[in-house]
Amino acid sequence: MFCLLNMITGILECGWISFGLAHAMPLWQILCYPLAYYLGKLFPKPFSLPKKLLFVFCSVTLIAAVILTFVPMPDIVRFVLTCLCLFLLSAVIQTVKDGIKSGEHSLLKRFFRVAGFALSPLAAFRPQIILFVAVVIAFCGLTKYTDSEYHFTVPDFKGGYSIAILFHQLHYFCYTHITIAAVSLALSKQPPVIDALGYAFTRSPAAFGSIAGILIFCGTQIIYILSEHIFSRLTKKSMTVFYIGQTAVFVILLSMSFITDTTLFIILWLFTGLCGGTVCTITKKLKQSVKYDKAPTTFSENAGCILGLLAAVFVSVFFCTYSPDIMLVCGAAGTLAAILCMIITMQKEKK
């Protein structure tokens, strides 16, 4: 069940990026879909929700999905209802995931999430079906969820570590989803370099670009997961690995903001996954230096995700076609902030 929940979250996070591209929506609206998903993901961390309320969330989502399927409405109303569905489903699924003990290996769980990303373009063609399937999976997950009382928990921040994690997530979500959209649009406007893909391109350039963009993103995720797995085991000099890897990410992101060649841009994007995997060393160092608690780390991660996406939405409203390049620079700045934060934290620990 845990792996299935992981897979559906991947579809919910990226599926409506493909939907928005297929329907030529403004970039800021496209980015609001993953923002709604991550707002829901943040909700269970500091709130603990009772099972009855989670069933209400699922029921409201089901009703909204039925309305979206059968009731004609203005596009803006459809947009708001879809964002509501993504928010509620994300809150339910994340709460259930937190409450279910999973015996599967972490790599397996994460690859199921990547599989969800790979399947997410289906939402461009059958968005209501995806919502119905997600609601069914959420209801099934709730049957295995142990009820809890409502309470609000204030996260116990771990000083510089929490801030560094927040900046890392902020840098990543400043550019990731907007880059998926930008690459998808670029690939929909130029014939593929691989001739065998030419037929798929001519049938539907928008669909081809959307699928190709998502699959390249999946490539960055696979490289990230594998590199993180390797970096956490290869060396005891965790901070050296972090500084080198994140400095490389800083340089790569700045370079990407000036590159106009799509192929070179994609290659560098894949390299961000390799170098970005070094972030695992922060958690490793945190476990070595203080009593480790996953909750504040998770909260910092989710807060960074939301701040990064909010920045991307805000910039895309005012700068439109220039916003992907601007957000790459913002992502580089976030990486630099995370590096400086860890340098200061390490210096304080030496005193």
Labelled PLM ranges:
Residues 1-34, 172-202:
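Helix-loop boundary and gating motifs at the non-cytosolic
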Residues 7, 75-93, 264-279:
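Hydrophobic core of transmembrane alpha-helices in multi-pass small-molecule transporters
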Residues 52-66, 240-254:
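Structural signature of the two symmetry-related core transmembrane helices
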Residues 122-134, 315-334:
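A membrane-interface helix-boundary motif in multi-pass transporters
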Residues 242-279:
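C-terminal transmembrane helical hairpin of 12-TM major facilitator-type secondary transporters
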Residues 294-318:
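A late C-terminal transmembrane helix in Major Facilitator Superfamily
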